[in-house]
């Protein structure tokens, strides 16, 4: 089975969020299931020389966009069994950022057209195309509307429904090359919506966790598409993301100062490293709580700013925060750190090496998200044997079971309602167990056995692909 993944970013080449992490690890897991996997993505201008020097030009051709034909280079290389293809066009992709330009509709219309034009030149013709997020959302629509000579089935994955690729209606006529009767399949509230086009036309829709698949069918989480998603629920599946266990391994991670596995003595040494780096008192006995996050409302940062002062004045605890985002939230965290310099430290940067050290050195990790389609940080936290405290939403609900001392089960702590009181109470509850050695050891044993890799999910994707292709054979 040949499966082509289409996405706008992929680790380690380009990354702005969790999509890149998924595309960096899922294909390798699918290869272990016996699938022949390739990935195609834009070749942005800041591709490092390490990768640039390995690329070979497969084919060059022109792609029609608006009234002009644009150059397209198809470049490729193979790494760890995955064939990576890059769509090269400097006009659209050699820019400072990956996203956020006025011609976004034209850029990613070109990308979708270029992917379809590339299909005859790939080493293996795909039996199925797996598209990710709105930037590849036109491909399922082209496959189902007679625009492609030899159409193949498509799977479309929603990584975050908030980002939909909505543009003025003129885009339909000027860019998309669809017949007029297909307008309704892409129109949403007077705009052309790339993501809606994918939902309507793909053979299957997946989300990145089972709970998120249910949540997005409600007005609270559906971002205006809940009605359509409820209508299409029969073809929608929630398949939990995983993390790359080879990449995220505290025993081999080059960023971890004292490598460890199931060894709290070495982990405490890493805590001292964090205390030093974050300029906090070096105390082994004080619980260290960490947060690594984009500093935005949806990540629950306002809950943290509400309770941080009370937390550190009523509990003997340290708080280390790493991330950037909303300037007002950054200012609030700077202010809290200035008020409590011996207990709160905030570094307004994002650096992967420092984040890895923080996962390794912290005792507890907080994720009070308002919504979280899947979340990878709680999985990394489990992998680094750091106890997560999460709000019960999306993938957080699916991965973290709140500790129950009566039966000794659970791999973290969680709260249901999005409010500061419940968040503070849950942190205090976790701290109570931290100070009870027997309970904490039992909790850590549960964490050691938590499954956060891709094996289970890769099998679910494989079964989904086989179901689609089997159905197609029957129909043929």
Swiss-Prot record:
It holds the Pfam family Glycos_transf_1. One of its GO terms (biological process) is glycogen biosynthetic process. Gene3D superfamilies: Glycogen Phosphorylase B. ADP-alpha-D-glucose binds at residue 15. It catalyses: [(1->4)-alpha-D-glucosyl](n) + ADP-alpha-D-glucose = [(1->4)-alpha-D-glucosyl](n+1) + ADP + H(+). Pathway: Glycan biosynthesis; glycogen biosynthesis. Its EC number is 2.4.1.21. Keywords: Glycogen biosynthesis, Glycosyltransferase, Transferase. GO terms for molecular function: alpha-1,4-glucan glucosyltransferase (ADP-glucose donor) activity; alpha-1,4-glucan glucosyltransferase (UDP-glucose donor) activity. The keyword Ribonucleoprotein does not apply. The keyword Nucleus does not apply. InterPro entries: Glyco_trans_1 (IPR001296), GS/SS (IPR011835), Starch_synth_cat_dom (IPR013534). It comes from the Bacteria. PANTHER family: ALPHA AMYLASE DOMAIN-CONTAINING PROTEIN, GRANULE-BOUND STARCH SYNTHASE 1, CHLOROPLASTIC/AMYLOPLASTIC. HAMAP family: Glycogen_synth (MF_00484). Synthesizes alpha-1,4-glucan chains using ADP-glucose. Belongs to the glycosyltransferase 1 family. Bacterial/plant glycogen synthase subfamily. This is Glycogen synthase. It comes from Halalkalibacterium halodurans (strain ATCC BAA-125 / DSM 18197 / FERM 7344 / JCM 9153 / C-125) (Bacillus halodurans). The gene is glgA.
């Amino acid at each position: 089975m040949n499966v082509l993944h289409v996405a706008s970013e992929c680790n380690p080449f380009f990354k702005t969020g969790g999509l890149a992490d998924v595309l960096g690890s899922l294909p390798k897991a699918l290869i272990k299931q016996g699938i022949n996997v390739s990935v195609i993505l834009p070749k942005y201008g800041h591709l490092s020389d390490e990768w640039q020097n390995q690329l070979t030009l497969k084919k060059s051709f022109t792609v029609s966009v608006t009234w002009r034909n644009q150059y397209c280079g198809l470049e490729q290389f193979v790494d760890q069994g995955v064939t990576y293809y890059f769509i090269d066009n400097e006009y659209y992709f050699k820019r400072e950022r990956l996203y956020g330009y006025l011609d976004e509709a034209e850029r990613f219309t070109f990308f979708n057209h270029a992917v379809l034009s590339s299909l005859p030149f790939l080493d293996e013709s795909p039996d199925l195309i797996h598209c990710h997020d709105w930037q590849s959302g036109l491909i399922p629509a082209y496959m189902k509307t007679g625009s492609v000579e030899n159409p193949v089935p498509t799977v479309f994955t929603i990584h975050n429904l908030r980002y939909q690729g909505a543009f003025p209606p003129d885009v339909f006529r000027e860019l998309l090359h669809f017949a007029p009767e297909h307008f309704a399949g892409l129109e949403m509230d007077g705009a052309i919506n790339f993501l809606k086009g994918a939902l309507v036309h793909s053979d299957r829709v997946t989300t990145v966790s089972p709970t998120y698949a249910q949540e997005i069918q409600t007005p609270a989480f559906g971002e205006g598409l809940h009605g359509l998603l409820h209508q299409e629920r029969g073809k929608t599946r929630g398949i939990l993301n995983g993390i790359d266990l080879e990449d995220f391994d505290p025993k081999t991670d080059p960023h971890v100062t004292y490598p460890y596995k199931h060894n709290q003595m070495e982990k405490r040494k890493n805590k001292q490293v964090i205390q030093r780096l974050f300029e906090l008192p070096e105390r082994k006995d004080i619980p260290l709580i960490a947060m690594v996050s984009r500093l935005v409302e949806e990540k629950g940062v306002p809950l943290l700013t509400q309770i941080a002062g009370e937390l550190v004045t009523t509990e003997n605890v340290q708080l280390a925060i790493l991330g950037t985002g909303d300037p007002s939230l950054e200012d609030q965290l700077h202010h809290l750190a200035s008020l409590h310099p011996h207990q709160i430290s905030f570094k307004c940067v994002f650096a992967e090496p420092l984040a890895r050290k923080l996962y390794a050195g912290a005792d507890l990790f907080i994720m009070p998200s308002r919504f979280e389609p899947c979340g990878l940080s709680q999985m990394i936290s489990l992998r680094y044997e750091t106890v997560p405290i999460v709000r019960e939403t999306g993938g957080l609900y699916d991965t973290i079971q709140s500790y129950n001392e009566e039966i000794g089960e659970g791999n973290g702590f969680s709260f249901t309602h999005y409010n500061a009181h419940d968040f503070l109470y849950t942190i205090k509850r976790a701290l109570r167990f931290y100070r009870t050695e027997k309970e904490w050891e039992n909790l850590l044993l549960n964490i050691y056995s938590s499954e956060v890799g891709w094996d289970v999910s890769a099998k679910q994707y494989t079964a989904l692909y086989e179901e689609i292709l089997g159905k197609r054979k029957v129909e043929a």
